[in-house]
Amino acid sequence: MNTITIVCSTRKIDENYVNHVKKSFSHPKNQYIFIENNGDKSLTQVYNEGIGQSTNDIVVFIHDDLEFETKNLTPKIIKLFDKNPEYGIIGLAGTNSLISGQWWEKRESMQGQVGHINGNKKYISKYSDSFGDKIKEVVIIDGLFMMIHKNRVKHNFDTRFEGFHFYDLPICLLNHLDGVKVGVTTKIKLYHKSIGMTDKKWLKNKLFFEALYEKHLSLIHI
């Protein structure tokens, strides 16, 4: 298999962004699934629909506000999974210790590197050194760019979580607890046109997540 599926949930499909994504992944036979969602469905629902529609083993979930620095992404992503068959989920940033629903709470446990754009400012958040060709095992990854091998994971997105928050933590944690490796790579460079947002909906999901997994949180570390 030399193609992958890319899934993006967005309020309104922007053809310029679609073209940027296609150019960055650099494979005309990839499957691109852009789903318009004004909030009628949770991100967990939309992403599970993407998995259901996918015709490839590897499914990449992306935010709709990314600027890709790395090009020709498709073969790079396939190579990551081919060389690391024990991994089912790979991202660009994460943590190897989880003590609450705020995964970035322990700065010293964070791994990976992600670029950000905030107004006119463009910078890279280096949570750790580069790993080169290696993958660093973590417990949780940030969902801005999630690569999933659907035949290796044992759990899909948890639809008990509503809205646009906490779609990433439960799927990573459940798979980690079931022996599926979750990892971070520094081989892919991009910029996120957002610095994240924690609002009342985020807090509601955070408390729900912590209630569900309270017995695991203090024990989860690699």
Residue spans for each PLM region:
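N-proximal low-complexity "stem/linker" segments adjacent to membrane-targeting elements
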Residues: 1-31
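Short aromatic/hydrophobic "clamp" motif used to bind/position activated sugar donors
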Residues: 59
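A short, conserved alpha-helix in the catalytic core of glycosyltransferases
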Residues: 77, 139-155, 160-188
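A recurrent flexible, glycine/aromatic-enriched loop bordering the glycosyltransferase active site
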Residues: 123-148
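Active-site donor/metal-binding and catalytic loop motifs
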Residues: 183-204, 208
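Conserved small/polar residues in nucleotide/adenosyl-binding loops
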Residues: 220-222
